[in-house]
């Protein structure tokens, strides 16, 4: 019997850090992209075999998520990509490591799964050596997306414009919580 998944929600938290001191923090509910909800839940729960296009493999950050005043734009839940992607990091099979397009390992992530509570937490840290502009000046971000290998975006969040340079780290905590109407069942 197949279960339809509903109530997939969660929490998004972004921090700009300098020497572990929080310079900026912003939190909001998760924004799960509608067409990928069931695929995401089944992937997290291990109900479908591992395939590159069914597991988290990519994160993109961009600057197209804010209004002129710096406030975040509204999300519809039907987005398919960032409005203006600036950097992209890809998981290439090694646990806890993401790579940029130059093959550099500059971003780390931590997965935490608590299936009894229906939680999946992903923490991504973009350190002070990456995510900056090529000229080592401020780079502004206001949107982030998580993607499967086939480029289906499954989570998207806009946030107030944040400026990152080589003295700061960007920390993103993304928590997904999911339930089925009859508990967890095999498809």
Question: Where do the model's predicted regions map?
Answer:
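Small cysteine-rich, disulfide-bonded extracellular modules of the LU/uPAR three-finger superfamily
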Residues: 1-141, 149-187
């Amino acid at each position: 019997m197949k279960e339809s998944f509903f109530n997939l929600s969660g929490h998004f938290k972004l921090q700009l850090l300098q020497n572990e001191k929080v310079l900026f923090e912003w939190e909001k509910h998760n924004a799960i992209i509608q067409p990928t909800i069931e695929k995401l839940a089944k992937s997290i729960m291990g109900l479908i075999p591992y395939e590159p296009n069914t597991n988290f493999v990519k994160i993109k950050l961009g600057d197209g998520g804010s209004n002129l005043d710096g406030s975040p734009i509204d999300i519809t839940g039907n987005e398919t990509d960032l409005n203006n992607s600036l950097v992209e990091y890809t998981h290439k099979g090694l646990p806890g490591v993401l790579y940029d397009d130059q093959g550099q390992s500059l971003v780390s992530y931590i997965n935490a799964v608590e299936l009894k509570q229906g939680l999946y937490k992903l923490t991504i840290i973009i350190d002070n050596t990456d995510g900056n502009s090529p000229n080592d000046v401020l780079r502004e971000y206001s949107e982030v997306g998580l993607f499967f290998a086939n480029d289906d975006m499954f989570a998207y969040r806009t946030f107030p414009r944040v400026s990152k340079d080589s003295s700061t780290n960007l920390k993103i905590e993304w928590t997904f919580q999911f339930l089925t109407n009859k508990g967890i069942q095999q498809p």
